[in-house]
Each structure stands twice: as C-alpha cells, then as structure tokens.
From Swiss-Prot:
Family matches, as InterPro entries: Glyco_trans_8, GNT1/Glycosyltrans_8, Nucleotide-diphossugar_trans
Marked site: Important for catalytic activity: K108
Main function: Mediates the transfer of glucuronic acid (GlcA) from UDP-GlcA to glycosyl inositol phosphorylceramides (GIPCs). The formation of GIPCs sphingolipids is essential for pollen function, plant growth and defense. Required for global fitness.
Membrane topology note: Multi-pass membrane protein
Key word Glycosyltransferase present: yes
Effect of a null allele: Defect in transmission of mutated alleles through the male gametophyte (e.g. pollen). Pollen rescued mutants show severe dwarfism with reduced roots, compromised pollen tube guidance, and constitutive activation of salicyclic acid-mediated defense pathways. They have also an altered sphingolipidome with reduced glycosyl inositol phosphorylceramides (GIPCs), increased ceramides, and an increased incorporation of short-chain fatty acids and dihydroxylated bases into inositol phosphorylceramides and GIPCs.
Cofactor(s) needed: Mn(2+)
E.C. designation(s): 2.4.1.17
Any GO MF annotation of the entry: metal ion binding
GO terms for cellular component: endosome; Golgi apparatus; Golgi medial cisterna; Golgi membrane; trans-Golgi network
Name of encoding gene: IPUT1
Domain of life the protein comes from: Eukaryota
Protein name as it appears in the record: Inositol phosphorylceramide glucuronosyltransferase 1
Length: 537
C-alpha cells in the first residue's frame, strides 16, 4: 500500500513538472523577433541580424517570413543559423503608381496576423541589434519610431498580432493613401494620431504601469532605431552612441553588405564586426561568405596577374626584350645625374639614352593628324568608364570591403590599359601607314636611327601609367588614411582628387597619342610592335 502511494506521488509530481515545463515553454514562445526576406539579395543582412540578436544574449524565437523569391538553399541556411522559416505569399501593392522596389512591401502587414505569438518585434533586414532589446516586449499594442517630418518608420516595430486588426487593414489598404507608395505610408495613414503617442519608457516598473491605462500605441526613442542617414548628415549620433540598441542602415542603395558602402559610411564598421563572427553553419558560410563568391574572387584575382606574367614573359623572350630593362636603368641614371647636378640636363647628357626620347623633327610633327589629341582624350575617358562599369559588374557585391576594392582596382587598371593600349597600337600603325606613303628622306633617317634601338622600352608610357594609377588609388584611399569619417568631406576630397586625375589623364592621353603616332612614323619598317599587346615593350 505504501509502495502504491509512493508511486502515485511520483507520478503526480512528474505530471506537475511536465505541465509546468509546458507552461514555461509556452510563455517563452509567446514573443518573437521577426524579419522579412523577399529574395536572396538580403540573405546576408538577415544572417547578420540574427547573429546580432543572439550576441545580446536573447533566446527568443527568431522568425523569418520568406517569399517565393527566396531559394531553398537560403531557407536551409537560415534554419541552420537558428531562424524559424515561414513561407508567405506576397501582398500586391494596391497603388497604381509606385516604385518597382515597392511592389510587394505591403507583405510586411502580415506580421499583424502572426497570431501564434502574443507580441512580436519586427526588424528590417538592414538593421543590427547592438544592445539587448528584450524591453521592447513591454511596449504597448503598437510601437514604432517617429522620424523626421512626423512620420513613423516601419523598420523597427512592436506589434500585438490580431486577426481582427489585420482584416481591418486589408479592408482599408485600397482606400487609405500612402505617401511612400508602400507599407510605411499606409501605416502612417492607418495610425494618424501616432505623433501624439507617448514615448515608451522601459524603466517604468510594472506596478506603475498597472495604475495607467494601456495606450493603443507608443513611440520608440532613437535608441531603438538609430538612422544611419541622419548620422551621416551630422557625422555623429544625436544621442550617446554607447546607449544605442538598434542601428538602421537607411541610406537607400548603400546597404551594409555591399563592399563599397564601407568606404563611404563609417557606421558600417559595426555591421562588419558582426558579420566576420558568423559561424560556418553550412560549408563555406563562415564570416558571411559563400563558396560561389570565394571561387569568383580567386579567379578574378589571379587572371590579371597571370596575364601580366605572360606579357612579361613574351617581352623577355623577344629578341630585344632585354633592352627594356636597359632603357629603364638609363632613365634612372638620367634622373640621378640631373638631381645631383641640381640643374637642367639635356637629353645628350647621358650618352646611353634611347634615341626615342630625342626631340622629333618639325617634318614629323607636321604629319600628326589635327584632331588626334581630342580623339585620344575621348577614347581615354571612354576606356575609364567601360573599365569601371565592367569591374563593378564582375566583382561580387557582398564580399569584404578590402577584397572588393583591390579587385575593382586590379580589373579597372587591367581593362583600361588593354583598351587604351590597343588604341595606342592603332595610332602607332596609323603612323606607319602614313610614313610608308611618304617618301621623305628625313623620315628615312629617323627610321634608321630608331631601328638601332627598336626594341627599347617606352618608359614615358610607363611613367604616365604609374601616375594615373597613383592618383586613382589616392582618390579613394587618402580620406581613409587621413581618418576622415564625414560623408560629405570624404566625397569632397574624392571628387577633388578625381578632378586632378582627370586633368592628368587629359594631358597624358593627348601626349601619348602624339608620341605613339610619331613612333609609328619612325618604326614603319619595324613589324615587331604590332604583333604584341604588351605595348610598353
């Protein structure tokens, strides 16, 4: 009998324990953090957001509402990162005229119908949590941050889901105006009295709250939705940055996962400090990377280097390739003697100087086409634009900032020198054709002189190329080296250096075109240059 009673007590205690555990588990699942993902482009942002939430010590559910545009691999990766993935259908934008990127943004309203949870904190994919925000679950029925012009921002919201509330929104979605053409404008119309709501104060005790009526909505302070756009205007936060809880990257196309944003927007450093700590939950995903981008980066980095080595090899293998180094050495010696003498040293001062650096005769100068300089400038800047466009198109967007910068420089320089080099070779060939048609004895003499050193390297072209490269690198790196963080100051310095670069390129392109045309006049009997794209030698 005693044993039976003991067994019954043990069974009763077990049932009570299970019930209590179930209750506690149910309580913990009544609230959640929620975000939306429309496509794979914002996947890295959601991953970093989740990591930032977990780094604050939160164990609440993290729910990612994903649309049909999200790949199965992305869903698998989010689950591996600890997100609960829920598939949803898009809500069409009812506005007749709206930006293309706002087509499905009304889908955000579906968070008001997440009735499995008592309360949810919604965070855009371009936000990060830098300090624990569990206090937001104390906020009333609807909470958001009031931005400039007395408009609420829907990037961070606290919502008490309700089917009745959601259905009411769906009935009014076609009748209420939206100043943005999206969900944010609709919510401002749906909650017209929001600017008059009181500010949420997480320090108020539960006892005090019980004595107050429950407000229909509350405003979140800037601490819970720190706008990077406003930061860039003043180059500082309007509040103590050590008290910030959420940073919101609102600068339109300048999203933190795009490598170039880090070179313009200082607060992106905080985002990348979280990104680099992302765990490898699936193979090749550590640090926010992916296997495809890693392979592309390696290919893009090695290909121009291999092409350069091949070009050098072909030059060395040439019958007169060694003269390139000799000419370069002679140029160094010339500069050394000039500095040492502290005066002007004529070209004849160094007897070993290549004849290609001697002044051209007036007869040869008269052969230069009238518009060659202007055409060369147009070709030069067209080559720059094409090089930049191709480089930004082929370099993956979501790689680390330094990696992206190095690859863009590498490919811009490579493509530019190839394009402009082909143009110089064309000008050189054009000079040859004109020289062949002319039977001027002065040109014959010039040709004979040049053929005695026909393989020597055109160091002047190399100097111009190095000058362009130096100014191009300085235009981006100098603000960083000087520690300038203000956006407009950075941009101003970059623009100033870019103007200097443009002036130098104008001068260099015009002089190089004339120089290579005159060399074509001299080289009309030499066929070695036209057979190689390695146009420096």
């Amino acid at each position: 009998m005693v044993r039976l009673k003991t067994s019954l007590w043990v069974l009763l205690l077990a049932l009570v324990s299970i019930q209590l555990n179930g209750s506690f588990g149910s309580e913990s699942s009544k609230v959640a953090y929620v975000t939306l993902l429309y496509g794979d482009e914002f996947l890295l942002g959601v991953r970093v957001l989740g990591k930032s939430i977990r780094d604050t010590g939160s164990t609440k559910d993290m729910v990612a509402l994903v649309s049909d545009g999200v790949s199965d691999y992305s869903k698998k990766l989010l689950k591996a990162d600890g997100w609960k993935v829920e598939k949803i259908s898009l809500l069409a934008n009812p506005n007749q005229v709206h930006p293309t990127r706002f087509w499905g943004v009304y889908t955000k309203l579906k968070i008001f119908n997440m009735t499995d949870y008592k309360k949810v904190v919604y965070l855009d994919a371009d936000t990060i949590v830098v300090k624990n925000i569990e206090d937001l679950f104390k906020c009333s029925k609807f909470c958001a941050n009031l931005k400039h012009s007395e408009r609420l921002n829907s990037g961070v919201m606290v919502v008490e889901p309700s089917e009745a509330l959601f259905n009411d929104m769906m009935r009014k979605v076609k009748t209420l105006s939206s100043y943005t053409g999206g969900d944010q404008g609709f919510l401002n119309s749906y909650y017209p009295d929001f600017p008059n709501a009181r500010v949420f104060d997480p320090s108020v005790t539960p006892e005090v709250l019980k004595t107050r009526p429950v407000p229909a909505m509350e405003r979140l302070s800037t601490l819970y939705n720190a706008d990077v756009g406003l930061y860039m205007l003043a180059n500082k936060w309007m509040v103590d940055d050590s008290k910030l809880h959420v940073i919101h990257y609102t600068l339109g196309p300048l999203k933190p996962w795009d490598w170039w944003t880090a070179w313009l927007v200082k607060p992106v450093d905080a985002w990348h400090s979280i990104r680099v700590k992302l765990e490898e939950t699936l193979p090749g995903t550590g640090g926010g990377s992916n296997q495809h981008d890693e392979l592309v980066v390696k290919f893009l980095f090695l290909l121009p280097l291999c092409a350069l080595l091949f070009c050098i090899y072909r030059s060395i293998q040439g019958r007169e390739g060694s003269l390139c180094w000799s000419s370069f050495s002679n140029q160094i010696r010339y500069l050394y003697y000039k500095v040492r003498s502290n005066g002007t040293l004529g070209y004849g001062g160094v007897s070993t100087m290549s004849p290609s650096y001697q002044p051209h005769s007036g007869n040869a100068q008269s052969k230069v086409p009238q518009h060659l300089g202007a055409v060369s400038v147009v070709v030069c800047f067209t080559a720059v634009l094409l090089s930049l466009g191709i480089s930004f198109a082929i370099v993956p967007r979501q790689i680390m900032p330094w990696t992206g910068l190095v690859l863009v420089y590498e490919w811009t320089f490579t493509i530019f020198f190839l394009l402009f080099g082909v143009f110089l070779l064309f000008v050189h060939q054009h000079g040859k054709r004109i020289a062949i048609q002319s039977e001027s004895s002065s040109l014959d003499d010039s040709a004979k002189v040049h053929q005695r050193a026909g393989g020597s390297c055109d160091v002047t072209t190399l100097y111009y190329g190095l000058g362009m490269a130096f100014l191009a690198i300085a235009a981006v790196s100098l603000p960083y080296i000087l520690g300038i963080t203000a956006l407009f100051t950075r941009l101003g310095l970059m623009v100033g250096l870019a103007i200097i670069l443009a002036a130098f390129m104008t001068y260099a392109s015009e002089h190089l075109a004339v120089r290579w045309f005159l060399k074509g006049l001299e080289d009309r009997r030499d066929t070695t240059r036209s057979n190689s794209l390695c146009f420096l030698c």
